[in-house]
């Protein structure tokens, strides 16, 4: 990560939207098993391993640097006072020191804001658990990372064998920067670069790079922002044909009567899950078989994500029905979709989302899954043309945005507007692909990695799943004022999975919950 790299508008938005009731960090609850003959200090071994690899994950040593007067997005700069002991902590669990206890502690910890004066991440190591297990709760601000980058970071930090791999130390000495040049000379170079581009105006516009001062005084920030706005305007103009095509496709779909029916199904009914949340969280996790889930998706003619949505739908439907609050109209889910290209491991956010009906108005599990497959296919078709627009929208920058966005977020939070406004979606469901091979850290085998995501005003429940080896690890996080004990909801998932398998005549094997 280049020192002084300014956050994109999408990354920075997670900072501006953050309030004490709505922290914007993501994390995980990992479970390790120590070797039977292990005699060391896992906390110290783990910390030493992280220290030796900090240079291959530069985001771990980067802190935020605000622009003067908050007139522009902040930048990532290397923390010259970085102290590993402010980021990795030894923690203890009360009796009975099992996974259920760890889940309750993780829910409490996840509600606490990260210190913005330091790099925005923390690890907590819980030793002394049952069955020679060790728990690891990690959290990192969403401004620095999305699910795809998080999975890449996992592969960077962990090993694929019990013996830690050797990592080359960082290269000594900093690379010399470019010689300072007169700003007029840089402008001339940029102009020459632009006019010598191929005749393809779109390509020339996309490749335009105007000079920056790279300084942090107000005058330089104003100049750099002006250069950025010019670049953005030129690139926007260069992308007009693509954007016009995307908008035309969207309008064409909307004019189709069948598409209008699909859009109507995406309107979210109000539920108990769509209220303002407190600063407290409830968390729980559970695992099911990945291969069996894929087989189920194949039998149903859908994708793995459809099965994930069907399981979330079944759990939410059952919970609301038991509390006599299930609406007649189907609930919807906000589903993040990654824009990250294969091999891209940059620590930033490259996502957009779609809204999908999850057929909670259908009782039969098989019919519900089939309806979800049909609805998700239509939602993808509706949202596909918007993919081309997302890079333009996510890079919009405006002077003064930090202050204005933070004021609006605070007003939204304090006024409880989500209690009266119609919800954009009822729940959030996210599926993050993870490693298929077994991972290790400091010689300990990684058994599970349960995601711990974000609960927001108006969408109190977030269900995120991470694939690992031959399992799907589900993490349920919710505002505790809405659902005080989300473990109750989490325990329903194995039963919903069994019901789906029974509907498709698949064998049902044991399913292990995170809290067992």
Show the residue positions of the predicted features.
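Soluble acyl-CoA-dependent acyltransferase catalytic core bearing the H(X)4D motif
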Residues: 1-10, 29-42, 47-459, 463-494, ...
